[in-house]
Amino acid sequence: MSDLTSTILFEHPLNEKMRTWLRMEFLLQQLESQRTLDNIASALTFFRTASDLIDVLERGEVRTDLLKELERQQQKLQLWADMPGVDMSLVDSLRSQLKSRASVLMSAPRIGQSLKEDRLISVVRQRLSIPGGCCSFDLPTLHTWLHQPQEQRNQHIDKLLTSLTPLNQSLTIILNLIRQSGPLRAQISLNGFFQDNAEGADLLRLRLPLDPQLYPQISGHKTRYAIRFLPLDSENGTVPARLSFELACC
């Protein structure tokens, strides 16, 4: 199942902290891909995503949780360093990166504050919950801004995204290390069902063949999880008695 073009990768968090991190990663990636705003549709998509990120950041102690995880990953690398045959140059490089990310994150302004204080984002956020509430008569500020030179708009967006760099860099290295901590292993589900112990994992990663058009419904926590495979076509689709897939507990 190594052909990535014929498979699809799903990820499922096993705790609230990981759920928040995956959502932040998803939103940060969207913001980065939408940074060129040249029409009302792209602008609204960007500002809606920025609004979602503000909401996610306000729900917990994001900086504290990330700093704790950066420290935890450094401790794990220290354990690796004591094992025979380990690539010490790689371990030292990762530890240096983790320390650097932690230092930058610690000294950074409050995460997301630049987004919250941005006047344009604030004005747009007030209208997002209103159906059709972003017309030119609702948001003349936005429509005027969209008629500014592209370079001026780019500078505005670049400044906002740069303010998120400490968050983005810390989150990226943490999630990369967590994802790499557990290899994908071949598994088989019986009659569309699979369950196992999570053993304190944070994240499940599951790779499925695109055919026969199934998706996983996952429930679980840090000690145990269950996966039920369901057909995309709920009326005519079928689930094979034995389904091969790959699974990683990270």
Swiss-Prot record:
GO biological process: division septum assembly; FtsZ-dependent cytokinesis
Source organism of this protein record: Yersinia enterocolitica serotype O:8 / biotype 1B (strain NCTC 13174 / 8081)
Protein's name in the database: Cell division protein ZapD
Quaternary assembly: Interacts with FtsZ.
UniProt-listed Pfam families: ZapD
PANTHER family: CELL DIVISION PROTEIN ZAPD
SUPFAM superfamilies membership: YacF-like (SSF160950)
Highest taxon above the source species: Bacteria
Transmembrane regions listed in the UniProt entry: none
Annotated Gene Ontology cellular component terms: cell division site; cytoplasm
HAMAP family recorded: ZapD (MF_01092)
Family to which the UniProt record says this protein belongs: Belongs to the ZapD family.
UniProt KW keywords: Cell cycle, Cell division, Cytoplasm, Septation
Lineage: Bacteria, Pseudomonadati, Pseudomonadota, Gammaproteobacteria, Enterobacterales
Function statement: Cell division factor that enhances FtsZ-ring assembly. Directly interacts with FtsZ and promotes bundling of FtsZ protofilaments, with a reduction in FtsZ GTPase activity.
Subcellular location, record wording: Cytoplasm
Main location: cytoplasm
InterPro entries with a match to the protein in the record: ZapD, ZapD_C, ZapD_sf
